[in-house]
Structure formats: C-alpha cells, structure tokens
Amino acid sequence: MSGYSSDRDRGRDRGFGAPRFGGSRAGPLSGKKFGNPGEKLVKKKWNLDELPKFEKNFYQEHPDLARRTAQEVETYRRSKEITVRGHNCPKPVLNFYEANFPANVMDVIARQNFTEPTAIQAQGWPVALSGLDMVGVAQTGSGKTLSYLLPAIVHINHQPFLERGDGPICLVLAPTRELAQQVQQVAAEYCRACRLKSTCIYGGAPKGPQIRDLERGVEICIATPGRLIDFLECGKTNLRRTTYLVLDEADRMLDMGFEPQIRKIVDQIRPDRQTLMWSATWPKEVRQLAEDFLKDYIHINIGALELSANHNILQIVDVCHDVEKDEKLIRLMEEIMSEKENKTIVFVETKRRCDELTRKMRRDGWPAMGIHGDKSQQERGWVLNEFKHGKAPILIATDVASRGLDVEDVKFVINYDYPNSSEDYIHRIGRTARSTKTGTAYTFFTPNNIKQVSDLISVLREANQAINPKLLQLVEDRGSGRSRGRGGMKDDRRDRYSAGKRGGFNTFRDRENYDRGYSSLLKRDFGAKTQNGVYSAANYTNGSFGSNFVSAGIQTSFRTGNPTGTYQNGYDSTQQYGSNVPNMHNGMNQQAYAYPATAAAPMIGYPMPTGYSQ
C-alpha cells in the first residue's frame, strides 16, 4: 500500500552530533550501583488534552481476507491452535501480502525465504496494525519478534519526523542483553530497508556509543530496563515521543525482579500509547501487569492454554542422584558428539557450577564454553558467537541464556540441574526445536527436586511424552512422606552402594523393580531407534505402563534376546546387559558407542583465546 511506504531518510539533516560543551559525552551519569533504580524519575502527570494527537490505526483489511467467512477463520484458528479473547479481534492473515506491509518490508521478507506467517504473526499483525493493545502468549521460536517489529515500522512511518532532542517512537523492553541484541539484529535489516534508525541499550557495554546513538535520534530503541533507567535519570534520552511500547518476555522480566523498573519506565510514557506484551507463559503476575498497563486488550494464545512445552521436543528424564550426574553427562556427550548435528546447551543452576563444569569438561578435552551473568559483555558475546558458528558446540549456561537465546540449529538441551520452576524448564528446553524443527531434551531429576515432580509430569503428559516410572514413584513417596530423610529414595540409595558402583542399575533388586514397572518385555522408554521427536512407539496409554506398550516390533526384539532400540532415561547400562546390547542410544539413531576397556586418550584440548580466564 502506498500509504505505508516511506522512502524518506528520517535521520537526514537533523544536525544531531556531539555536544559542544566540552568534557565527557556521557556527562554525569549516575554512579550508584546499589539503592533504588529510578528513584530520581518523577511520575509524570499527563493531560491528554494538551498532548499532540497521533494515529495508531492503520489497518485496512485485504479484499481476500474480507471475503473469508467466519467458519473459515475459525477452522484456521483451530488448525493453528489460536485462542483469542477480547472484543472486535480482526481476522488472521493467511499470507504475507494480506497484511499490506510496505514494499520495502515485503522485499526483506522475500529475501529471507519465509513461506507463510507463523500462527502468532497471522493473528498478531492485524491486531497490532489496528492500534489495539494486545497480549501474545506463544512458545519460544514462534516468530514473536517480527510480530511486533513490522507493525512498529508501519506505526513509525505514520508519525511526524523526530526533531532534535526527541526520544524513540518505539520502545522495546527486553529482560537480557542477549535478547536485546538479537531483537536489534532483526530490526536492523528492516530498518535499513525503510531508512529508519534503531539502537540497542543494555548494561555491561560502554555507555558512550549508546548515548551517541540516542543523541543522533532513533525511531526504535531496544533496551534492558536497568540501562534505560540510568539514561532516563541523567537526561540522556526521554520517552516523550514514545507511542508504541513493547514488553518482550514479560514473564522473564518479572522473574528477574524488573517489575519496579518497568513501572517507572511506563510512568514516563503517555497513557494513550499502544502497548504490546509478549510472554511464553501467562502466570498471575503477568496478568496483573497486563491489567495495569493495557486497555481493552486482545489476548492471543498459541497452543495449549495451560503450561505446555513444544511438542517437537523429545523429553527424556533420568531420575538419579547428584553424585551420578557427571558420569551420566559424559556418557551422554560421547553419544551426542558422534552425531553430525551435535550443538548442545547444558543448563546448570549456579554460576559456580557453570565455571566448575566448564573447566572440568575442557580439561577432559571437550569443546565446551560457559556463559553466565558474571561474564563480561565482551566475553559473553564472544562465547555465543563461537557457539553459534559451531567452533564450540557445547555451551554450559545458567538461566541468563535460557530465554531469548535464538540459535537455529541447537539439537540437544541437557538440564544438568533441574530449574526452580516448570516455566523455566519449558523455556530451557525451548532452545531446541526452533520453528518447525525437532530436538531432544535430557533432564537429570534428583530427589532434591521433588517439589517440582507433579508439574514436570503434567508437562510431559501434555506433550504426550513417556513418563519415567521413577517419577511416578517420587510422587508416591512424596505423598507417603518418604521422599526425604530416611524413607526417601530408599531403594536407590541401597542399590547404589551395595554394588560398589554409582551408575545405572547394578543390583538384581533394581532390575526386578525395573521389570515390574515396565513389564518384562520392555526395558526402555521408547521404541526402536526413536529420534528427535519421532515417536516410533506411541502406544503408552494415559501415562500407564506395562502391558499398554504393545509395539510388536519392540516385543519381538526383546523376546529374541537381541535387544535394540534406545538408551533412555537412565534405565539401562552397559554393565547390566554387557555385550548383549549392541546398540546404546540416547534418543538418537546411531551406532553404539564402544566403551573401551581402558580409558581413552582425551581429545585435543580446545584452546581458549588469551584474555579469558577459566
């Protein structure tokens, strides 16, 4: 549409440059490291009658969309698992051209070889272009970034030019610098095509270049709350012109304790703005934030309304003890690294554990690198770049990287430490199986995590995953008060030490319990050669086991005494079956790893560049 197009360089001849007062460009920035961030910001008292008017409804329904019947719309929404709440929600667009984006935006879309809008884009674009407030709840990797960036470009093109001293028109708040940088990378390509300017404001990087961008004028500012409040307090930018506000991963920002900063920032923005809130979950804290910041909003949910994981992810849970994790991790990595696609993220709970595990794996020759919040921005950026380009295919991370980390070809996620909530679990495993791809998530679950066992089982059942019988046993133990102390995991502790080893099943009692839980015909959670979300034996019924697993191929393989299939959930070990098990798999279709009689020579150490201590 011609009304959307704009070939004007909005930053041309505005005369923005360095201040001519001498001294530091940064000026007297707040040096307080502790205290109350934003305490210098005064809540503005807005008088809408005195504010300049602005337009925010630019949506014109495409003729093809107008001819689509309500029944066709409902059929499409059901097929894409789109749930809509709110009044007067526009119809979803089924093709890019139906959104009526400017020609230069469509050119970028064509270069990126997108075939059709994702579900959240199809329903989100008409809502955002209509100027309505909205909440979008969708799983990771669903295309949320373009869902708000492309309508933002249309919104900006219909606003007056920025003048000297004006702040951004579009503000995107993100929880982490990694996510902010990724949004900036996406925005930069479209902004170049539309002759707009964008910048990324985050902590851990020099303030000078960021201030320089703001002084020159930017239409789009992607920022983390802390650094933005710092700049607002010292007067390096303002939000007087902001009419399009995006809260990306709002649930994560609340988890990280940013709610006070978010509220102080929103107080600086005119109340008749358009606000879009995006989240992967919909807890009561996010609902309250939406009620406070949004007006008559449209709620769009993609997928199940309850807490759910991506169904393209094969989830494997190993119930074990903390002392067994290292051995299990190494055996798992030996199989994963023999795969052609082996990019893996290992999540741990603490920064100390991240550093210790990284040092240990690198000492043993594994190409691993670590990332957590105490790393400098330069080092974090370098580590992520090495991981993205496959130079270090093993990334050991805390939850700082669990949200918004968008690496397309991550095939495996390992939860070395189980997170504190099922929401974090879903976000962690969501680093694999981006878009329509498949992936595998392994989780070490210990008795210390028993408070999360019910939620984890619910997530597994919703995604039609096989459930480890030991998880069900933990639920029973918890109900009978035997989950901790003398009664908890009684058999596991006795079996672990009675055989003198700490790995797998080492006693006849363990095998007996194992047979009872799965039936004597099945010694594994999944059928023959299950690979990355392809459920070759899907005959589990309502989470029950034993005779309900009726795959004839599996039964035959075990009756013949030559078992094949998958090495899943820690219920099998080389010591148990010995040479009778030719194939040991971890949810992958590959040749068995041949465990040598003596320790193999370590791999060549992966060199760390100078300047980064381990």
From Swiss-Prot:
Source superkingdom: Eukaryota
PANTHER family: ATP-DEPENDENT RNA HELICASE DBP3 (PTHR47958)
PROSITE patterns given in the database record: DEAD_ATP_HELICASE (PS00039), HELICASE_ATP_BIND_1 (PS51192), HELICASE_CTER (PS51194), Q_MOTIF (PS51195)
Protein purpose: Involved in the alternative regulation of pre-mRNA splicing; its RNA helicase activity is necessary for increasing tau exon 10 inclusion and occurs in a RBM4-dependent manner. Binds to the tau pre-mRNA in the stem-loop region downstream of exon 10. The rate of ATP hydrolysis is highly stimulated by single-stranded RNA. Involved in transcriptional regulation; the function is independent of the RNA helicase activity. Transcriptional coactivator for androgen receptor AR but probably not ESR1.
Chain spans, region Transactivation domain: 477-614
Keyword Cytoplasm: yes
UniProt modified residues of type N6-acetyllysine: 32-33, 40, 236
InterPro entries named among the record's database cross-references: DEAD/DEAH_box_helicase_dom, Helicase_ATP-bd, Helicase_C-like, P-loop_NTPase, P68_rpt, RNA-helicase_DEAD-box_CS, RNA_helicase_DEAD_Q_motif
Residues found modified as Phosphoserine: 24, 480, 520
Domain Helicase C-terminal: 328-475
Protein's UniProt name: Probable ATP-dependent RNA helicase DDX5
